[in-house]
Regions:
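Non-catalytic interaction-recognition regions
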Residues: 1-121
Length: 121
């Protein structure tokens, strides 16, 4: 989980160095994120609040831990299948935003568990 957070941070640093910036959600064409691994990652991201609710209800932080491991797995599959760098500009921006949202959820989930989210490994 920490490695995937660091990997996303590295990706963002590299693309920022090439003149790209993480776009605002309003500047992304979400319809371009229609591939199987992209939609699986989006679905997994959408479950974060529910997992937080379950963890609070059950007084069981392992809900968050399991969720983060599953999210990291979804991101790994996405990153393996979907190119970000070198894609058409609109696709690059959409995938970069998806990666950044994943980074944010990983960071917040790790913080809830009292674990640092490294930007480099």
């Amino acid at each position: 989980v920490e490695y995937d957070h660091a990997r996303i941070c590295s990706l963002i640093r590299n693309l920022t160095g090439e003149g790209y910036a993480v776009p605002a959600a309003a500047d992304v064409d979400a319809a371009l994120l229609s591939g199987e691994t992209e939609t699986a990652l989006i679905k997994q991201l959408s479950l974060f609040c529910e997992e937080l609710r379950l963890a609070a209800r059950d007084y069981d932080p392992s809900h968050i831990n399991r969720y983060l491991v599953e999210l990291a797995g979804c991101f790994h599959r996405f990153y393996t299948v979907c190119r970000i760098k070198g894609e058409e500009d609109a696709v690059l921006k959409a995938r970069l935003k998806l990666a950044d949202e994943t980074r944010s959820v990983l960071k917040n989930g790790l913080a809830l568990l009292g674990v640092d989210a490294p930007e480099k490994m």
